[in-house]
Amino acid sequence: KAVSERIAKTKSEKIAGFIGDMTNMETIYAAKDFFEKTIKSENLESRYEKLYINTKVRSNYLFNSSIEGIEKSDLIILIGTNPRFEATILNSRIRKNYLKNKTEIISLGDVGDLTYPYQVIANNTDTIKDIIDNKHEISEKIKKSKYPCVIFGQSVLKLKSAPYIFEEFKNYLLVNNKISDDWNALNILSKNSSTVGSYDLNVLSKNSSYEILDKLENNEFEILILFGQDNLNFEKKNEFVIYIGSHGDKGASI
């Protein structure tokens, strides 16, 4: 009763909700419905940090080559990811491919022991630009590859240059016919199980902006409803926090 009364007394634009990393789609849908129909607010966000994402096309945030497809890839490029720690099953498939086919694996930056050898190239935006402009040795390898697999990790999506890196690399793959109905070389490796479902339901700021996260940082909300969200990093002032969850407790202690 106290919670419902507090919500009723607060302006809708001063209420925000955040989806946690293990929230199922049914709960996400219910949360979205609750915010739209009851609270009359669009302040529902699934990201806890500023990640670039373009949800206009679903393939922009999927692992399009598929986990099984990794095994037939003839060139694997890792950009901003360590699959050994971020996706162990995926990493085992990459290792299986290497052991069977000696597939060439390239990583932008040294990410440590992945249990298979890989070539390390400079980890910066200039490298991406050189590849796109056909000025890097990797460019020709991508063109010659029949089933290339380019894997973007979340760390690269946090960069200020993320829009350029993602959109231009995607366009490069399209121009070179590496994105088609038969094979899609573009892959996003999401760390959280709820990410794809949240994007499918469009649970993020308008136009994929950082509006809600910016307002959170600036303490513009009076009520925060956390649906199992335990990863928010902000300096709490007078926000009234409602925590709904079972898998973690950090959010409950805010």
Task: List PLM regions with ranges.
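Catalytic alpha/large subunits of respiratory electron-transfer oxidoreductases
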Residues: 1-254
